[in-house]
Curated annotation (Swiss-Prot):
Protein's UniProt name: Vacuolar protein sorting-associated protein 18 homolog
Annotated source species: Mus musculus (Mouse)
UniProt record similarity statement: Belongs to the VPS18 family.
The protein's assembly and partners: Core component of at least two putative endosomal tethering complexes, the homotypic fusion and vacuole protein sorting (HOPS) complex and the class C core vacuole/endosome tethering (CORVET) complex. Their common core is composed of the class C Vps proteins VPS11, VPS16, VPS18 and VPS33A, which in HOPS further associates with VPS39 and VPS41 and in CORVET with VPS8 and TGFBRAP1. Interacts with RAB5C. Interacts with HOOK1. Interacts with STX7, MON1B. Associates with adaptor protein complex 3 (AP-3) and clathrin:AP-3 complexes. Interacts with SYNPO2. Interacts with PLEKHM1.
GO molecular function: actin binding; syntaxin binding; ubiquitin protein ligase activity; zinc ion binding
Main subcellular location of this protein, as a coarse class: membrane
Record's bilayer topology term: Peripheral membrane protein
GO BP: autophagy; endosome organization; endosome to lysosome transport; intracellular protein transport; lysosome organization; negative regulation of intracellular estrogen receptor signaling pathway; protein ubiquitination; regulation of synaptic vesicle exocytosis
Length: 973
């Protein structure tokens, strides 16, 4: 056998297919370019299954990807479409002439019922290999089965409904258990529930569907040839005792509601559309004599499951006459009718035929058509071939259908992922609303389209619909990108103009007060919207001009606050002399730059409140930048003006610790003009060190001199260390102050004496007060009576100076005695020194013949040597070599010079007159040999090389000279 039911094999033959749908979108007016201009794949694509049956196909059912077909009269073929290459062939093994009447497969694909023309029914489970007869069902020609989707599973069907050709509805339950010869039968029970009648009596039950609503109610729809019955009641229970019996018991005394149509095909068929497996069905289609009854299924309705019903007539050439429909299947937006030679698909929204698919005669007439709800595939078959339809993107053009029906919400739902189509729908909806005078809705839709902005705005202007135009502009503004600044500026400016014009028109109308308030609130919402803040900020200059041109000062201030343009707000309050409100804005937003700008204005009107605000700002303000405002304010010289300036400057100096010279200088000037008492206290608090004061000393001196504050000038002189000037000025004020100044130069006694002489001269010559002059002598020990006497006039008697002269003489006498004592002590000390020197000349050391040099370890007496008090002995040349490396460079140079001069000096000759003459001549020319030796000894033998400072300094000296180490290192390489 060839590969069976391969899903994606190329079909061996294709019939002529007519698929009609909505035309391609093309390039719409909005500016969108369709991305679907190329030819699209058809919605319904037919494919013949690569399968050639060995016998004629009599019946075929598909569910949950499981396909079952009957071949001939005695063969069943079961195929798992996921494993199509492994079909399961089952022989029924019947000897009579009974034919397969119908087959029924449940929603799980597990339970198969085979109804025979001999009124017998066979049952076969997916896991079983044998068809088992159902004894309780014998004698009933089964026409339909209503499977229990809520309770059925692979091992049991749960309670199900069975419709027969005699109009009876039975309840039954099947089990998949294999009981063997003596085991239980698969049909657990089979009992009658109801009989369906038409006008002539019982009628065959053509279709049965059982569903369960979300509220727990049960629904059963049963159809005959001309009627559609509904049974609504208590939900199906999971017990054999109740099942569907309770639901049908409610209709024992009265018939259920039904729909009836006059025409008769001799049969009918009901199809449901279920979006997903095990979900509730959404729509139904009933094929009967008058056409197809189509509608929605609404489980929430109390009295009927059916809603939005309408009858679609059969297409031309189809009907109860010569070419009746044989079967119907329902998809999301189409129902497909099976005819003997073709398949026709009809749109459930419009009733138009969108597909007319003819089949080749060689395959024979079509028998039936079924749908697999789990995959959405449609299956049609003839006696010699099987065909499958793929449904692809069925909803692709539904949006246009809904658009033509003016059902815009549904149209937008089905083209949400296609911007070009969505734009078309929105534009059509906007036009529709505009024609219906629903201008606000129209504006909202227009704002979402890509239609030309100018055309839409002009439409609203011509219709005098400013409110709708504002709505359109606002929504357009909200949809702009950050880079579209020009458009944003235009829209914000236009919106502001519209609001202002509307407010101006409503403001004077007392009957429109509520509307005015609402419009004002909308305008403020627009101005304060965070979404529009960026655009409004960019257009703030234009908007302020508009507000000013309309004279709307209220909103001008409101907008300035929103834009945080507090400078404009403060300026507005100042212009209207609302200075306290201006200060409140400054204090609330604490912007230093605004304080600097508006303080010169505010301080003239509310100085105390402004200074309080300055103090509240603390270190956030730079006091230097506020000085100009204070200077202009305090020029009037009034006490209140100066006191407020001083209050802030004192806060800066005492609390903030300001050290800026300009601030301290200005505070000095304020003290000098307004509070002289505080001036000296400030200067004294600042200290007397010229390097630590924060004011300009020269400026302070000039300022104090200009205002006649002499004590302050004296203090500044003292800080400048100009003590003579300080004393001169202090003598004009107070002698005691001058005395304080005179004692300041403690380290310069000459200057102190000079200053006290100034004071004494002043006291004697200006005040003529001898007692005070004598007191000056007592206050300054540097002054003597003889220093002061020249200042007294000649007529003054000596009685005034008696005590002073006596004291002076006593002091001189005491001083002379001290000098004598010191001289005696110096003489005694000199005698002791001479005695010590004599003793030193007599000191000596003993050198034994066996003593050796401390450096070379050779006998010491072989060469000239040095002997130190510590006991170390060195040859002269050995000591020279040991000392030389530790000497500084200048001493090493001096040592070489002495050695050179000693080498050039003539050796001494005893008893020679010529030698004495030579020494005398050499002495006349330069140092003698003895002097050179003495200098050399002083340089080399000043201390022991092992015990002296030289050894201590050599502790951190390396054992090997760095240069020598480098030479040794290179020699080994």
């Amino acid at each position: 056998m060839a590969s069976i039911l391969d899903e994606y094999e190329d079909s061996l033959s294709r019939s002529a297919v007519l698929q009609t749908g909505c035309p391609s979108v093309g390039i719409p007016h909005s500016g969108y370019v369709s991305a679907h201009l190329e030819k699209e794949v058809p919605i319904f694509t037919k494919q013949r299954v690569d399968f050639t049956p060995s016998e004629r196909i009599t019946s075929l059912v598909v569910s949950c990807n499981q396909l079952c077909m009957s071949l001939g009269k005695d063969t069943l073929l079961r195929i798992d479409l996921g494993k199509a290459s492994e079909p399961n062939r089952v022989e029924l093994g019947r000897k009579d002439d009974a034919k397969v009447h119908k087959m029924f497969l449940d929603h799980t694909g597990s339970h198969l019922l085979v109804a025979l023309s001999s009124t017998e029914v066979l049952y076969m489970n997916r896991n079983g290999q044998k068809a088992r007869p159902l004894a309780r069902w014998k004698g009933q020609l089964v026409e339909s089965v209503g499977w229990n989707k809520a309770m059925g599973n692979e091992s049991s069907t749960g309670p199900i409904l069975v419709g027969t050709a005699q109009g009876q509805i039975f309840e039954a339950e099947l089990s998949a258990s294999e009981g063997g010869l003596f085991g239980p039968a698969p049909d657990l029970y089979f009992r009658p529930l109801y009989v369906l009648n038409e006008e002539g009596g019982p009628a065959p039950v053509c279709s049965l569907e059982a569903e369960r609503g979300p509220d727990g109610r049960g629904f059963v729809i049963a159809t005959t040839r001309q009627r559609l019955f509904q049974f609504i009641g208590r939900a199906v229970e999971d017990t054999e005792a109740q099942g569907f019996a309770g639901l049908f018991a409610a209709y024992t005394d009265h018939p259920p509601p039904f729909r009836e149509f006059p025409s008769n095909l001799g049969y009918s068929e009901l199809a449901f559309y279920t979006p997903k497996l095990r979900s509730a069905p959404r729509a139904f289609a009933w094929m009967m004599g008058d056409g197809v009854l189509y509608g929605s299924l609404d489980c929430g309705r109390p009295d009927s499951l059916l809603s939005e019903e309408r009858v679609w007539e059969y297409p031309a050439g189809v009907g109860p006459g010569a070419n009746p429909p044989l079967a119907i299947v329902l998809t999301q937006f189409h129902f497909l009718l099976l005819l003997a030679d073709r398949v026709e698909a009809v749109c459930t929204l419009t009733g138009q035929v969108v597909l007319r698919d003819h089949f080749l005669e060689k395959f024979g007439p079509l028998r039936h058509m079924v749908k697999d709800s789990s995959t959405g595939h449609l299956w049609a078959y003839t006696e010699r071939a099987v065909f499958r339809y793929h449904v692809q993107r069925e909803a692709r053009d539904v949006w246009r259908t809904y658009l033509d029906m003016n059902r815009f919400d549904l149209a937008k739902e089905y083209c949400r992922e296609r911007p070009d189509c969505l734009d078309t729908v929105l534009a059509r909806e906007a036009d529709f609303c505009f024609r219906q005078h629903r201008y606000l809705e129209s504006a909202r839709c227009y704002a979402l389209t890509q239609s030309y902005f100018e055309e839409i705005a002009l439409k609203f202007l011509e219709a005098r619909q400013e409110e709708a135009l504002a709505e359109f502009l606002q929504r357009k503004l909200a949809g702009l990108k950050p880079t579209e600044r020009t458009q944003a500026t235009l829209l914000t400016t236009w919106l502001t103009e519209l609001y202002l014009s509307r407010l101006g028109a409503l403001q004077g109308d007392p009957d429109a007060l509520t509307l005015y308030r609402d419009t004002r609130e909308c305008f403020r919402t627009f101005l304060s919207s965070p979404r529009h803040k960026e655009w409004l900020f960019a257009s703030r200059a234009s908007i302020h001009e508009l507000l000013a041109s309309h004279g709307d000062t209220e909103h001008m201030v409101y907008f300035a606050v929103i834009m945080q343009d507090y400078e404009r707000v403060v300026a507005y309050h100042c212009q209207h002399e609302a200075y306290e409100e201006a200060l409140a804005v400054l204090a609330r937003h604490r912007d230093p730059q605004l304080f600097y700008k508006f303080s010169p204005i505010l301080i003239r009107h509310i100085p105390r409140q402004l200074v309080d605000a300055w103090i509240e700002m603390g270190s956030r303000l730079d006091a230097r930048q506020l000085i100009p405002a204070l200077v202009n304010y305090s020029q009037g010289g009034e006490a209140q003006q100066v006191s407020q300036a001083i209050r802030y400057m004192e806060f800066c100096v005492n609390v903030l610790g300001e050290t800026e010279q300009a601030i301290h200088n200005y505070l000095l000037s304020l003290y000098a003009r307004g509070q002289p008492a505080s001036l000296l206290a400030y200067l004294e608090q600042a200290g007397a060190s010229p390097h630590r004061v924060h004011y300009d000393l020269k400026y302070a001196l000039r300022l104090c001199a200009e205002h006649g504050h002499h004590r302050a000038c004296v203090h500044v002189y003292k800080v400048l260390e100009l003590y003579e000037e300080a004393v001169d000025l202090a003598l004009q004020v107070d002698v005691d102050l001058a005395k304080q100044c005179a004692d300041l130069p403690e380290e310069d006694e000459e200057l102190r004496k000079k200053l006290w002489l100034k004071i004494a001269r002043h006291v004697v010559q200006e005040e003529e007060d001898v007692q005070t002059a004598m007191a000056c002598l007592a206050s300054c020990p540097l002054l003597k009576i003889e220093d002061v006497l020249p200042f007294f006039p000649d007529f003054v008697t000596i009685d005034h100076f008696k005590e002073a002269i006596c004291s002076s003489l006593k002091a001189y006498n005491h001083h002379i005695q001290e000098l004598q004592r010191e001289m005696e002590e110096a003489t005694a000390s000199a005698q002791r020194i001479r005695r010590d020197l004599q003793e030193l000349r007599g000191r000596y050391g003993t050198v034994e013949p066996q003593d050796k040099c401390s450096t070379c370890d050779f006998p010491l007496l072989n060469r000239p040597f040095y002997l130190f008090l510590c006991g170390h002995m060195f040859h002269a040349d050995c000591l020279l070599q040991a000392v030389r490396p530790g000497l500084p460079a200048y001493k090493q140079a001096r040592l070489e010079e002495l050695q050179r001069k000693l080498g050039a000096a003539p050796p001494p000759t005893k008893g020679s007159v010529k030698a004495k003459e030579a020494e005398a001549g050499a002495a006349a020319v330069g140092p003698s040999r003895e002097q050179l030796k003495a200098d050399l000894d002083e340089l080399v033998a000043a201390e022991c090389v092992y015990c002296g400072e030289l050894m201590i300094r050599s502790i951190d000296r390396p054992f090997i000279d760095p240069q020598r180490y480098e030479e040794e290192h290179l020699s080994w390489l």
